[in-house]
Amino acid sequence: METFEERYALMHAAVQKHMPGADMALIDRAVEYADVKHQRQKRKDGSPYIIHPLAVAEIVAELGLDMDSILGALLHDCI
């Protein structure tokens, strides 16, 4: 089962690769907020739900989309 730390590292690397100079402090704030909002949620396989938004943000970064899109990916299930 994938951990938060593993998925965060993959997302972080994708952002740095495709968006050098990105405001990682802003991304980290969004990750922290999403993590709090999904704190008690688990996926069907038992992994923490936060893995999903991190994976979506990684895909968005790899597609070369902008910062707002990455933040939206991280926060898309927080409402």
Say what each PLM segment does.
Residues 1-79:
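Active-site helical microenvironments for divalent-metal-assisted chemistry
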